[in-house]
Regions:
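Helix-loop-helix hairpin linking two adjacent transmembrane segments in secondary transporters
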Residues: 137-183
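Cytoplasmic helix-loop-helix junction between adjacent transmembrane helices
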Residues: 102-141
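Extracytoplasmic gate region of multi-pass secondary transporters
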Residues: 26-27, 209-266, 325-326, 330, ...
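Hydrophobic core of transmembrane alpha-helices in multi-pass small-molecule transporters
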Residues: 85, 97-112, 298, 309-325
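Conserved MFS/SLC helix-loop-helix module at the cytosolic interface between two early adjacent transmembrane helices
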Residues: 57-97
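Extracytoplasmic
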Residues: 7-41, 229-234, 359
Length: 402
């Protein structure tokens, strides 16, 4: 049985691989689906954003349920739910209303996943290995996005949903057989006890501490630009930079670099703490600064060029640097709230999903009002990143507050 940290990291990272792959299928497939069903730009925006409605609604449920019933059961439920919802998309594609509902269910299932994984990691992964653990988690997610981008470009859009929807069922069998929770309780054992074991915390405590809000805001700002890239990059390359369908494969490049940087940044961050004796707070602030300010700068470069290869290069660097956040604010939950990391991440991810809901329709409206120009979309995204970095640098902490 895989009870050791490395086995836990592997299985959870594979789950995130499938999670991230399933998220990318629709932004790729929607180009062909739009040609077949004659959807307008606003219709596409709502289809893309409906996922985020379900995703946001289940974050706190996932963190709380994992704490009460154990991570194994909730992560299994999450993967099965989002996999089924991916598999059945072709059956609902004839109706935007039905498709929107199925996308919400997909989002609800995926929304249970990451808070549950954070709960599992905070209870089973030692502090000095957490940056690497979250680095691998993010890296496998990026690899999933990369593979989905490349494979979906060569598949009929219906088979794209069938193929990636099936992966979760295979993972479920492996998870049931290999992952074993502590039988003595519904909760995994802490690998290191928290300084203060605050089991019963009032809900108001989760929104009353600036170190927590610095994490929430940084996560929100990171996702603003990430959602724009994930949702609209294929459409932008095809419609604005005159790319062709084979150029869609170029959108895999950002996810490749993201996966590499996620792993490298994790090892680098842990080495700063263990070998070079940096404080945990200094490392979290450094990695978050690079992960927010770097993408903010390169998304401005991306918006200023009309050359497709150069645009892909800039957006690749943008998403690559964003992976540094996995060793920054995304790893900070287990330090400020070790007993409640699943719930704090759920709150953070709920707020960070708001851009996923509004960026689709907002982008469509901004581009329409700007007569096809995308610059306002990207300048806002860059500004949001810079604001997030400043707030995290000034308000973050690495000591326990809950």
């Amino acid at each position: 049985m895989l009870t050791r940290p490395h086995g836990t990291i592997l299985l959870c990272s594979i789950a995130n691989f499938i999670n991230s792959a399933d998220q990318v299928v629709m932004p790729i497939a929607i180009v062909a689906m739009t040609d077949e069903f004659k959807w307008g730009l606003h219709g596409q925006g709502w289809v893309l954003s409906s996922f985020a409605v379900g995703y946001m609604s289940s974050q706190v449920i996932g963190g709380s349920a994992a704490k009460k019933y154990g991570g194994k059961k909730i992560l299994l439920l999450s993967v099965l739910l989002w996999s089924m919802s991916t598999f059945i998309v072709p059956f609902f594609a004839h109706s935007i209303f039905a498709l929107t509902l199925s996308r919400m269910v997909l989002g609800f299932g995926e929304g249970l996943g990451l808070p549950t994984i954070y709960h599992i990691f905070s209870h089973t992964i030692p502090c000095e290995e957490r940056s690497r653990a979250f680095g691998y988690l993010v890296a496998l997610g990026s690899i999933g996005q990369t593979m989905a981008t490349v494979i979906c470009a060569h598949l009929n859009w219906r088979w794209a949903f069938y193929s990636f929807g099936s992966l979760g069922f295979v993972w479920a069998f492996i998870w049931i057989y290999f992952y074993k929770e502590n039988r003595s309780s519904n909760d995994e054992e802490f690998v290191e006890p928290p300084k203060v074991n605050n089991i019963n915390v009032h809900w108001s405590e989760f929104i009353c501490h600036w170190p927590l809000w610095s994490i929430y805001i940084a996560h929100f700002c990171m996702n603003w630009s990430n959602y724009i890239i994930m949702q609209w990059l294929p459409t932008y390359l095809l419609r604005s930079l005159n790319g062709n369908k084979s150029d869609i494969m170029l959108t895999a490049a950002p996810y490749v670099l993201n996966s590499v940087v996620g792993v490298v940044a994790g090892h680098f961050a842990d080495s700063l703490i263990v070998k070079h004796k940096w404080t945990v707070l200094s490392v979290r602030r450094l990695m978050t600064s690079v992960g927010l300010m770097g993408p903010g700068l390169f998304i401005l470069f991306f918006s200023a060029v009309n050359n497709l290869p150069l645009a892909v290069l800039f957006v690749t660097i943008c998403l690559g640097l964003s992976a540094c956040n996995s060793s920054g604010h995304l790893s900070n939950h287990a330090e400020v709230a070790p007993s409640h990391a699943g719930i704090t991440f759920a709150i953070s991810n709920t707020l960070a999903t708001i851009p996923g809901i509004i960026c689709g329709p907002l982008t469509a409206e901004l581009v329409t009002q700007s007569h096809g120009r995308w610059f306002p979309v990207f300048i806002i995204a860059a500004g949001v990143n810079f604001v997030g970095a400043i707030i995290y640098l000034s308000q973050s902490a690495a000591s326990q507050v809950l």
